Amino acid sequence: MAMVQPKSQKWRLLATHLLMFTFIAMILFPLLMVITISLRPGNFATGSLIPENISWEHWKLALGYSVVSPDGRVTPPPFPVMLWLWNSVKVAFITAVGIVTLSTTCAYAFARMHFRGKSTLLKGMLIFQMFPAVLSLVALYALFDRLGEYVPFIGLNTHGGVIFAYLGGIALHVWTIKGYFETIDGSLEEAAALDGATPWQAFRMVLLPLSVPILAVVFILSFIGVITEVPVASLLLRDVNNYTLAVGMQQYLNPQNYLWGDFAAAAVLSALPITIVFLVAQRWLVSGLTAGGVKG
């Protein structure tokens, strides 16, 4: 026997689908516009959503190849986009690994150990994290200018300095991982201790394998945050060859010459590392959500 839905429920279902499709369109439209601009001849930001003529000149320049026009004029790549992309991936990956490592060990101490001032430290970390990084730019510049005199590889205009600056923003990740650790039954580590495991072995062989989903989330959030970060990187990096892609892309928007097509191609390239990392870590994210739903 077929079920008959009330008319009011049908309208609610229709409204839900309309809102969902509208939301998806709002997300996809800017992406389609950027892709269209990258495939449109010339460096124009306006035009039809579907280009009449498709040109690969902007993609060739972004990938480091020269473009030869019909009149024989050779246009070399204006900027080292692929080098910037490599710098972004390198800095983001090292930073994300460092953040996961530091956050995990700190979160373990706060979740499993008892010491004086723990609550004050946790609250203090959270309060300091609430202040935007822009407020500390002057202090960061002075700090890394002085550090560079003693330790050159973490001074100004170095990727080490940028990574070191990013590693300071772990407070929210510590809170996130700490909360996840507290949902794991401590009796598992106690059982490992009865079998002769040291606290470090229990942490490494019991707690960490059970925490892979949240570690994947922290890694992805850290990776995306570094890939898209501009203020700190633009302050500390001076040499064009040391730029990350997010910083270097500003060179396309010179007031005398806006290279919108080249900018759009570089913007699409900047999304590739984020997409790849998300696809690789997707199974851990899904398993984490599923496990959370089962455990309640």
Curated annotation (Swiss-Prot):
Transmembrane regions:
13-35, 89-111, 124-143, 153-175, 206-228, 258-280
Name the chain's protein. Answer: Maltose/maltodextrin transport system permease protein MalG
Residue intervals annotated with topology Periplasmic: 36-88, 144-152, 229-257
Q: How does it sit in the membrane?
A: Multi-pass membrane protein
Is Nuclease given among the entry's keywords?
no
Q: Which residues form the ABC transmembrane type-1 domain?
A: 85-281
Q: How does it assemble?
A: The complex is composed of two ATP-binding proteins (MalK), two transmembrane proteins (MalG and MalF) and a solute-binding protein (MalE).
Q: Which UniProt keywords apply?
A: Cell inner membrane, Cell membrane, Membrane, Sugar transport, Transmembrane, Transmembrane helix, Transport
Similarity comment: family membership: Belongs to the binding-protein-dependent transport system permease family. MalFG subfamily.
Recorded name of the encoding gene: malG
The record's Pfam families line, in alphabetical order, gives: BPD_transp_1 (PF00528)
- Organism listed in the record: Photorhabdus laumondii subsp. laumondii (strain DSM 15139 / CIP 105565 / TT01)
